[in-house]
Amino acid sequence: MSPPNAPSATRIPTGARLRQLAFAYLGRREYSKQMLIDKLAETGADLNAIQQLVDELADSCYQSDSRMASMTVRSNLRRGRGQARIKQDLKKYAIDPALAAAELAATDWLQQAIQLRMKKFGATLPTEAKEKARQFRFLQYRGFDLDICRQALAWQDEDE
């Protein structure tokens, strides 16, 4: 038997303590259903109890994969990342592929690539092959598709 003042890390949370722990995690940041299950499982609690708790939290809208997906997409768009990089993040967070596709479909990827290219390299289009290749690699590294990269490098502002 462990002493009464043993560190809480050695105690296995159950019931109310497990719920309290889940709310503490969700209070700090958004978690996908699978991420929250994995995080709570690290404590050594019963997997059935964890699954039941996470389902209950999802039904009560405390946890939402949809909210997690939209937050991830918005966050990555602000960082200048393309569709492939964002898909990779959503997959890492165990977001349902149909939900991920719905979130990604709402974005104009060409406009994102153009804005990113202009922010990094300026409004003038590259004329030399070396500079075109450099900008093309930059956009590809950020996760934009080949067609989007080509279109972004060919796009010319009508105001000029």
What spans do the regions from the language model cover?
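An alpha-helical, amphipathic repeat domain used for nucleic-acid recognition
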Residues: 1-160
